[in-house]
Amino acid sequence: MATIQALRGTKDIFAPEIAYWQQVEAVVRDCLGRAMYQEIRTPIFEQTSLFERGIGEATDVVSKEMYSFTDRGDRPITLRPEGTAGAVRAYIERKLFAQGGVQRLWYTGPMFRYERPQAGRQRQFHQVGVEVLGSADPRADVEVMAIATEILQKLGLKNLSLQLNSVGNGGDRQRYREALVDYLTPFKADLDADSQERLERNPLRILDSKDQKTQEIAQNAPSILDYLGDDSKKHFDQVQSSLTALGIDYVLNPCLVRGLDYYTHTAFEIQSSDLGAQATVCGGGRYDGLVAELGGPETPAVGWAIGLERLVILLQQLGEASGPQLDFYLVSKGEQAEAAAVILAHKLRFAGFSVELDLSGSAFGKQFKRADRSGAIACLVLGDEEAVNQQVQLKWLQTKAQETLAQADLLGNLESWRQKMQQAKH
């Protein structure tokens, strides 16, 4: 019988790789928690119309990449390709706007797009995202960019570049769209096939083409920054001056338009030169019209998403992930000893120590070898004799020093043992 394997574009994550994921999640929770962002959890699948209306039917994500199907109730359903639309749907449905003020939200989880799998790009991939809803202030744009920068810096990542642009408001984009089409039309035959199609329905996306010839043509295209109205210019100037005041370097990139139709004003990406073609680690911007487009009140908003797979690739390049060290590896042999070991392991774990209990039932020699490989600070040894006498042998695995203790002394002086374990770690 043929074995069943994971689908193309998906992967299982085990140790030691999982340690990098845990490292990222810990830093994210710390940074966002201190900035008072509230975690939300939204469904993995939504009505297809949410993404058609929210992301835009002309985008590649909606027209080519979504996992969509009709369920048994004849409802069109889509596995979420990104997180913002679902977060906004929840914001509207739960009437969070009625609370007044600014809502700072964040989420993490799997997303799904039918793409060609490659390094840093999977069909099931994972993102962390933030959404700030209810503020049109340029400081909100700067806050989310500063937090993204902080997360990446705390992870120790280098060779990063914040790419910054403004796509203005609807009127700005319409004026620019006309100028861009006028410029590109004479070059239509030289554009790649996707860009020729986009020229008619979504010309700004041509600026984001990965085709070399199209990129060369786009380099001389008019800049959207020259088509910003006074309000858009003022907003973008304030964003830039605040980033400068924070000491956050950025590069103006007039070709940066992002792949989703809902963006307005600020658009940005954080890219890594260590990732090759899939260089974008974080992408986001302002989306002042999305809440109203999805049936809510006019609500300004800004956010970003970080791709976790690409972060993990960068962290792996830096070296081994630093996971928590195991305190005790507990070995036992004999009926009474094995029963006592279960109780001792539970009590130590409840007290806050990490304990791995050997469940193999093999000879002590084999258990000791596993203890040496476990990375534990100390090995606890229980035989039937120790179990009867309420004792335990403790062996420090680095120094090989060994002593016999009463279990009551071990459990009764946990703070003293905690200090000893901390000293052994250093």
Swiss-Prot record:
Keyword set, alphabetical order: Aminoacyl-tRNA synthetase, ATP-binding, Cytoplasm, Ligase, Nucleotide-binding, Protein biosynthesis
Main location class: cytoplasm
Keyword Acetylation: no
GO molecular function terms noted in the UniProt entry: ATP binding; histidine-tRNA ligase activity
PROSITE patterns assigned to the protein according to its UniProt record, in alphabetical order: AA_TRNA_LIGASE_II
An example Gene Ontology CC term for this record: cytoplasm
EC number(s) given by UniProt: 6.1.1.21
GO biological process terms on file: histidyl-tRNA aminoacylation
CDD domains in the record: HisRS-like_core, HisRS_anticodon
The UniProt record lists the keyword S-adenosyl-L-methionine: no
Gene3D superfamilies with a match to the protein in the record: Anticodon-binding domain (3.40.50.800), Bira Bifunctional Protein, Domain 2 (3.30.930.10)
Subcellular localization(s) per the UniProt record: Cytoplasm
Enzyme class: ligase
InterPro entries cross-referenced by the UniProt entry: aa-tRNA-synth_II, aa-tRNA-synth_II/BPL/LPL, Anticodon-bd, Anticodon-bd_dom_sf, His-tRNA-ligase, HisRS-like_core, HisRS/HisZ, HisRS_anticodon
Pfam families from the UniProt entry: HGTP_anticodon, tRNA-synt_His
PANTHER family: HISTIDINE--TRNA LIGASE, MITOCHONDRIAL-RELATED, HISTIDYL-TRNA SYNTHETASE
Subunit structure and binding partners: Homodimer.
Protein family: Belongs to the class-II aminoacyl-tRNA synthetase family.
HAMAP family assigned: His_tRNA_synth (MF_00127)
Name used for this protein in its record: Histidine--tRNA ligase
Gene: hisS
